[in-house]
């Protein structure tokens, strides 16, 4: 399966909001990430049943700027979206068993996220 999201990738963790809930701090994703996640929904296909068997996840991130970014945070945001929008049942190691080939590159004119899911 191949999914292309033609939007500049955004991480989930770098600029979160801390709110108090019943006396305990809770970290919420930043507004830019929340907007990114909503925009991405239209590019993620709907599956009848989420994938629940081992896969290799390969993601190519093409960033709009050369600013340093954390590939781990990008990958976590992508996995969370794939679970939220019903592509993956979960993002634990029994389903996402490898992430071979994931990379970050620069493409000012065409920032995007290319997701490749291959069943093992």
Residue ranges with predicted function:
Residues 1-120:
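Acidic, proline/glycine-enriched N-terminal capping motif
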